[in-house]
Structures are given as structure tokens and as C-alpha cells.
Design a protein with these regions (language model features):
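Second-shell loop/turn segments in exported
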Residues: 129-141, 184-192, 307-314, 323-324, ...
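Bacterial lipoprotein signal-peptidase II cleavage site
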Residues: 75-82
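C-terminal motif of bacterial Sec signal peptides marking the signal peptidase cleavage site
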Residues: 71-73
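Papain-like cysteine protease catalytic cores
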Residues: 164-264
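Long, intrinsically disordered low-complexity tandem-repeat segments
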Residues: 11-55
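Active-site signature of cysteine proteases
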Residues: 77, 248-430
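Bacterial N-terminal signal peptides
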Residues: 60-69
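N-terminal regions that are enriched for targeting/export leaders
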Residues: 96-129
């Protein structure tokens, strides 16, 4: 038994000696080899490996940087209006326009995006009416149609009534009217699709309306080109009836034939009946503010696009702003017609303002209009209000250039900008 224990102890001792030799009791040469394998390299070897690791890290960093640049370049939208991207006072920067803006989703998503972008720049949204998706007028002069319909849509949406109207239906009827006048005047009447906000109300009352889903196309129609083709086709016909049919064919080829009836909530309407159900003849009124006409009267404003000779009720500037605010407080959107050719109108950044050095008074406003510094360029729909931490008041306006800017198709108009550059307002009756 003792011999067996001695033998076991001897075996254990020899095993420890072997392990000791294997794990640390090596000769200096062997230890040097293992040390080299585990990091104790000579300076030259360390330098080579460090350089290799540095080159790998540099390559990885460059690849990551290149991928970020490519992704940012592909996702950046193209703005309709050229801007320098500078930051306006209390405004938004053009960097926000790199956000994904191709799909609106639900109304709540639009509101959340607007409020989030504004919040990042110290602007608080205080009022935002429900809106239908932002549309794109494309290569057409139909901002007045889009803005008027958007005001009607948002006002109905605020009252809990969902309605989305077709701009192409009004554009078709405008085309037919202009082509008739052009043919009957033997080309002396200008074939123009430009207009003002009250002209859209005229078309609704006289020709009716169509739901957007019943009469629209997936992409914007070039109504300028369509009108040119219509004139050429009509001029080739010897009689008025045949000329009208030729123009109607051009419109059919562009957007399709007009449905004879409107089906809504299980009921059948004519286009005129449907228009009366969404826009009464006395529901909207036009206002302006210029001193070359007396206040308190309906005036025929001298605008090149006022083709129907519509009148606007002339009021003092403070009254005009009061009407705008009261309409928004009553959950009614407002059609806006005015000047966007100013340097302070930054579409990509989503903000419009005038320099602080400009006195936004009735007199200065009139002076700029008289000198043609304020022109009738564009129409928008005012659907909300906001205020910056510096106290600057803004109006939130919906555009018709698609969701191509920082606010996904909306823009903040400062109160100073509205006071100086508004030509007319389309305000709902109380």
C-alpha cells in the first residue's frame, strides 16, 4: 500500500514537472518564441502590424463615409423653388428637406412631422386644421384651383366631413371655356390657364365638382401642353361644334372622360349638385387691402389673372389680419393669394419672412404694390398658426408643389410676410 502511494506521488511530481516545463519553465529560446506569438514582439514587427491595423481602420472609415454620402445624396428631394438654404429669422433650415417626404401616410403623421420639425427650431405649433394629402400641380398654372379646393377640403375635415376634390375636373372646364373664347375670337383671346381664387368658386358653381378618386391621374398633367394641343386641334375644325369636340378629345386623352354622375355615400349626384353639397354659393368671400381704392367697398382688383373680373371687398390691413385669425379660430381654412418672388420666401427651408428693416405698414405695403415689388404670383391655403420662442407669429400654409421641402409640402409664413405680401384672402362665411 505504501509503495503504491509512493508510486502515485512520484507520478504526480513528474506530471507537475512536465507541466511546469510546458507552461513556463522553458529554455530562453523557447520562451522567446512563445512570447513573440503572444504579443511580446520586437519593435519592427510591432510597427508592421500596427500599420496594417491602421490601414484597415482607415479603409473601413472611408467605406462608411462613402455609404453615408451616397445614401444622403439619393434621399435628398428636389425643391420646386431654388433657394440658397440659408436660415431665416426664427425659421427652419434647408437641411431638414433631406427627410423622406415621398409618402404622407395619415393626417396625424403630417401633423406630427410639422410639429417635430418646428420644435427642433424653437417654433411651437398652436393650431393646425386637418388636411388632405398635399397634391402636385406639376407643369401647370393652376395653383388657384389647388388652393381653393384645399381650403374647402380642410374646412370640411375640421367639421368631421371627409372630402377630397379633383383639381383636374376644374382644369378641364377651364380649358373648355378658354378654348371656346379662343376659337370664337379667332385667336385674339389669350389661351391662359392662369387665374385667381374666386375663379375656382365660379367654376364650382357653374360646372360642378368631382371627387379626387373619380377624376385624377397618378402623375400631374401638363395642362400648358394640353391647352396648346387643344388650340391647334380646334383651329383645324371649320365649325364651333367640331372644334369643341376636338378640345374635349384632347382633355380625354390627358385625364380621361368625365363620369356622368358622382356616387357618394350611397347617393347619386350630378357634378353641379355635388359641388353645391360641398361649397354653397354664399359660403366664401374675397378680401383685399389697398389704399388706391376706398375701404368698405367691393372693388375689381387690377390683376392680370383676374380673367372673370371678380370683385374683392377692400378693408384696412389690420382688419384683413383679424379676418384671417377669426376664420382659423372658427376652424375654417383660408385661401391665400400673394407674392412669392421675394428673397425671403424659402421653399426648401419651409419659411417665408421679410427683413426686419421693412416697416410692415399699410403705407409701405401700398408703396411696394404701386412699384410692382408686390405681385400676384401664387396661391396657398392657410391651415394653422405657430409662434417662435422669440415671439414671431407664423401662419402654416399648404402648398401644391408636392411634399418636396422640410415641412413636406407646407411652409411657415411670418405675420410680417402676410401683412406685406398678401394680395387677397378667400375667407369662409361665419
Amino acid at each position: 500500500m505504501c509503495k503504491m502511494m509512493d508510486m502515485a506521488g512520484l507520478i504526480k511530481t513528474e506530471a507537475r514537472d512536465v507541466n511546469a516545463t510546458a507552461y513556463g519553465c522553458m529554455k530562453p529560446a523557447a520562451r522567446g518564441v512563445n512570447a513573440t506569438a503572444h504579443g511580446c514582439m520586437k519593435p519592427a514587427a510591432r510597427d508592421v502590424n500596427a500599420a496594417a491595423r491602421g490601414m484597415k481602420l482607415t479603409a473601413i472609415f472611408l467605406l462608411l463615409l462613402l455609404s453615408v454620402v451616397l445614401v444622403a445624396g439619393c434621399s435628398r428631394p428636389t425643391a420646386r423653388k431654388d433657394t440658397d438654404g440659408a436660415t431665416a429669422t426664427d425659421g427652419l433650415t434647408a437641411a431638414d428637406s433631406a427627410a423622406q417626404v415621398t409618402d404622407h401616410g395619415a393626417r396625424g403623421d403630417v401633423a406630427r412631422h410639422i410639429m417635430a420639425v418646428c420644435r427642433r427650431h424653437g417654433v411651437t405649433v398652436t393650431l393646425l386644421l386637418p388636411v388632405t394629402p398635399v397634391k402636385n400641380q406639376g407643369r401647370s398654372d393652376l395653383c388657384w384651383v389647388y388652393a381653393a379646393l384645399a381650403a374647402i377640403e380642410s374646412t370640411h375635415a375640421a367639421a368631421g366631413d371627409s372630402v377630397n376634390l379633383s383639381p383636374d375636373y376644374l382644369a378641364r372646364n377651364m380649358l373648355m371655356r378658354q378654348a371656346r373664347l379662343n376659337w370664337l375670337s379667332r385667336g385674339r383671346h389669350d389661351m391662359s390657364m392662369r387665374g385667381t381664387l374666386p375663379m375656382a368658386l365660379h367654376l364650382l358653381r357653374e360646372d360642378g365638382a368631382m371627387p379626387y378618386d373619380s377624376y385624377s391621374t397618378p402623375s400631374p398633367i401638363n395642362w400648358r401642353a394640353t391647352s396648346r394641343r387643344a388650340v391647334l386641334a380646334a383651329n383645324c375644325e371649320p365649325t364651333f361644334d367640331r372644334a369643341e369636340r376636338a378640345v374635349a378629345t384632347c382633355a380625354d386623352n390627358a385625364v380621361g372622360s368625365v363620369p356622368p354622375h358622382v356616387f357618394m355615400l350611397g347617393a347619386e349626384y350630378s357634378p353641379v349638385d355635388f359641388a353645391q353639397s360641398v361649397c354653397r354659393s354664399d359660403e366664401w368671400h374675397m378680401f383685399t387691402s389697398f389704399t388706391h381704392h376706398p375701404f368698405g367697398r367691393d372693388i375689381q382688383l387690377e390683376l392680370a389673372d383676374n380673367q372673370f373680373g371678380d370683385t374683392f371687398h377692400n378693408v384696412p390691413l389690420d382688419t384683413l389680419i383679424h379676418l384671417l385669425d377669426r376664420s382659423l379660430d372658427n376652424a375654417r381654412a383660408v385661401g391665400w393669394e400673394g407674392d412669392i418672388s421675394e428673397e425671403g420666401f424659402r421653399w426648401a427651408a419651409g419659411v417665408a419672412d421679410v427683413p426686419r428693416t421693412v416697416a410692415c405698414t399699410q403705407q409701405e405695403r401700398q408703396r411696394q404694390f404701386d412699384r410692382r415689388l408686390t405681385t400676384d404670383d401664387h396661391c396657398l391655403t392657410i391651415v394653422g398658426r405657430a409662434v417662435s420662442r422669440r415671439g414671431t407669429r407664423y401662419y402654416i400654409a399648404k402648398n401644391s408643389w408636392g411634399a418636396t421641402n422640410a415641412l413636406r409640402g407646407f411652409i411657415l409664413l411670418s405675420e410680417r410676410y402676410v401683412r406685406m405680401k398678401t394680395v387677397a384672402l378667400m375667407v369662409g362665411a361665419e
